[in-house]
Amino acid sequence: MGWTNDYHLDINTQQNYWVSNVGNLAECNTPLFNYIKDLSVHGTKTAEVVYGCKGWTANTTANIWGYTPASGTIIWGLFPLASSWIATHLWTQYEY
């Protein structure tokens, strides 16, 4: 998952967990869910300061220290819906 010690909150992270439910390995989701929980705390500040919004957000790149602002080029680095994208894994777990 790591790209220079960061997580890319797009298909690069999610595809590592796709098999967890269908493979009867739901407990393997726990680290991702814990990470999403921690990220949401840091992403609350980003949503407020950068976008003037309530809730939380993250962009394409994030790390274990809670980095959530956009980085890199606009083409791939600006993805303020990454939090929604990664949260779909929570919903998939619920549906399963």
Tell where the protein language model's regions lie, with residue ranges:
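Substrate-binding groove/exosite segments of carbohydrate-active enzymes
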Residues: 1-96
